[in-house]
Swiss-Prot record:
Stimulates transcription elongation. Residues 94-124 form the KOW domain. PANTHER family: SUPPRESSOR OF TY 5 (PTHR11125), TRANSCRIPTION ELONGATION FACTOR SPT5 (PTHR11125:SF7). Composed of only a NusG N-terminal (NGN) domain and a KOW domain, similar to bacterial NusG. The NGN domain is the effector domain of the complex that mediates the interaction with RNAP. The NGN domain closes the RNAP active center cleft to lock nucleic acids and render the elongation complex stable and processive. The KOW domain may interact with RNA and/or other factors. This is Transcription elongation factor Spt5. Pfam families: KOW (PF00467), Spt5-NGN (PF03439). CDD domains: KOW_NusG, NGN_Arch.
Length: 152
């Protein structure tokens, strides 16, 4: 029999920690929990797959930061998009203005020159550089500041 998905309310910012604590309890007490999902884009909630709500209640009992199970089930279609991994460079186009948020160039503003979705990398040229040298950076090291304005 397939499990049902339930949303568990947790303390904002403690989603991953709470999921790990629940996982540890599930392993210790051999509870019938099939999956625990803590998507980074959803704050204050984690999703637990189990045969019924009672099992989830048992799993979160005594767990710090777990606030309770929401009534009802969560349809799989509502969380399916969290399971698809999108490259960090999706949505970027050549000419976009980005800020480097990690690595040795952190804080620098740059213009996107080229995008390699297969490697999840982006080639940029720094705005403030005296000599414009293209630099390849990991896609999750950049944050979009503004899109290229397309003229019609």
């Amino acid at each position: 029999m397939a499990g049902k998905i339930f949303a568990v309310r947790v303390t904002h910012g403690q989603e991953e920690t709470t999921a790990k604590l629940i996982y540890s309890k599930v392993r210790t007490y051999n509870l019938p929990i099939y999956a625990i999902l803590a998507p980074s884009r959803v704050k204050g909630y984690i999703f637990v797959e189990a045969p019924n709500k009672g099992v989830v209640d048992e799993a979160i009992r005594g767990i710090r930061h777990a606030r309770g199970v929401l009534p009802g089930e969560v349809p799989f279609k509502e969380i399916e998009h969290f399971l698809e991994e999108k490259p960090a460079v999706s949505g970027l186009e050549p000419g976009d203005l980005v800020e480097v948020i990690a690595g040795p160039f952190k804080g620098q503003k740059a213009k996107v020159v080229k995008i390699d979705e297969s490697k999840d990398e982006v080639v940029v040229q720094f705005i403030d550089a005296i000599v414009p040298i293209p630099v390849t950076i990991k896609g999750d090291y950049v944050r979009l500041i503004s899109k290229l304005q397309k003229e019609e």
